[in-house]
């Protein structure tokens, strides 16, 4: 299938290249890149493009990261302003080599965007900061509209798929965000097709709601290469629809579920909808 590169896509690609920035859209080979970029939403990946972890589902390069680029927050903010983005998502590689896990750079990036593009909504998709709540506070106090941290898979599969992470820490992180900022939208995402059962997925949904998570995304895992975890099975569209119904019945304010759904999919639509619900 041939996908058309619209003018918005070309503009964003030009600015990203010219500003020496990274996007997770490209680094993680997201299937929705054309859709999102043409909607003027993008996910910038800060803290470099080399991750200190090597999760078995992720296409991002792992290894020893370079030194911090202290000019990165300003370049991201200038790019957001130049492109007139409606919604900017800021994510990062894991930086377990840094004392604050990169939280300070997240905060500087958020504030720089706010200063130059006050009408742009901002979502952060953070690592787990190794359970450091001080790092979480640093990001929350910068005031993003959405705080996203992905649970990724069910706890039984963590040792195989996400060996350096702890399921309970991911949930606790998002609960702490809500404790610090009750009106901030919290969000998490799951991949399916890694060998989980429906019962395990539903239990994760329950755990998320018990930790006051507002928005859920559920998408099909696609194997980036032969060195990554194999796909156990592909879910049918009606299975995603059923999972969405169950999640909404549990009280999630917004759910995106489908084969190509990723954590930032249609993220620009989630901020006003959920904020109005929380305000009401």
Where are each of the predicted segments found?
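Small/polar loops that bind or transfer phosphate-bearing groups
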Residues: 46-47, 124, 257
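Nucleotide phosphate-binding site architecture
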Residues: 31, 52, 155
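Canonical Radical SAM [4Fe-4S] cluster-binding loop centered on the CxxxCxxC motif
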Residues: 35-72
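Glycine/Thr-rich phosphate-binding loops of Rossmann-like dinucleotide-binding domains
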Residues: 54, 98, 157, 226, ...
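Auxiliary Fe-S-binding modules of radical SAM enzymes
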Residues: 1-43, 74, 78, 108-119, ...
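Core AdoMet radical
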Residues: 59-76, 80-133, 139-173, 187, ...
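Conserved functional loop/turn residues at catalytic and ligand-binding sites
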Residues: 50, 54, 59, 84, ...
